[in-house]
Amino acid sequence: MKKHSNNLDLFDQTEECLESNLRSCKIIVGDAREAVQGLDSEIFDCVVTSPPYWGLRDYGNGGQIGAEDNINDYIKDLVDLFRDVRRTLKDDGTLWLNIGDSYTSGGRTWRDKDDKNKGRAMSYRPPTPEGLKPKDLIGVPWRLAFALQNDGWYLRTDIIWNKPNCQPESVRDRPTRSHEYIFLLSKGKKYYYDWESIKEPASDPKMDKKNRRTVWNINTEPYPGSHFAVFPRAMARLCVLAGSRPGGKVLDPFFGSGTTGVVCQELDRECVGIELNEEYASLAKERILRRR
């Protein structure tokens, strides 16, 4: 990968353009909060992404989004980032945002460190946010959704990602959580949405297909070589199909292992992915080249 200094003079970015027989995918290694500022305005059809969840995973970089001391700073960091992202969207562009929830720590602030697990849990657990009690469900997805709405985004719908193969939890005082949220937000009142491309089978045999509902049953999807469950291709495919035209351009500011890029290659879209962790960026490159 080729290193170069960017015009912000704030950090080093690695940019790599992977050409295929169909479309290109550019991977930028750096902090999304800075990298997005170097992107042109109104160039993307849609954004498909899953930010790091607050206080859950350590991706090995100081100052990373998700490692804030309190939930309000986490929400603010994401609102500020997605305000810059909105500038890069076409006027009819959309944001497809996957975000999970978490619970307050119950007063415990430290976990045992796990250096062998690259996607390890945070060794530091943020204290219980003001106004909440130990063991409370924080409501992170809706806090973020309403904050984005207040910042100018159109909040169009919530989608429940139901995970049939969810990980078990060692809890006996509540149900095991088996879902996350996907929010569809738009830059403007009118936006591109190809509903026909993601129609689902109808239960009525007289009907061919019907408008897709807001509960998506999609298994989590591990990938060999990673230490975490990657963004499922089936879910990314629905977002890319509905949110972009054939030959269009998609942004993922939290590229991770590159699922959005893999799907864009399959669907004849260009993609720009931003990833803070160089190891994950290398994994993303490998996946895109192998189309896996």
Swiss-Prot record:
Family: Belongs to the N(4)/N(6)-methyltransferase family. N(4) subfamily.
A Pfam family this chain is assigned to: N6_N4_Mtase
Region span, Disordered: 110-130
GO cellular component: cytoplasm
Catalyzed reactions: a 2'-deoxycytidine in DNA + S-adenosyl-L-methionine = an N(4)-methyl-2'-deoxycytidine in DNA + S-adenosyl-L-homocysteine + H(+)
InterPro entries: DNA_methylase_N4/N6, MeTrfase_CN4_CS, RM_Methyltransferase, SAM-dependent_MTases_sf
Molecular-function annotations in GO: DNA binding; N-methyltransferase activity; site-specific DNA-methyltransferase (cytosine-N4-specific) activity
EC number(s) stated in the UniProt entry for this protein: 2.1.1.113
Organism from which the protein derives: Serratia marcescens
GO biological process terms on file: DNA restriction-modification system; methylation
Broad EC category: transferase
Protein name: Type II methyltransferase M.SmaI
Domain of life: Bacteria
Keywords: DNA-binding, Methyltransferase, Restriction system, S-adenosyl-L-methionine, Transferase
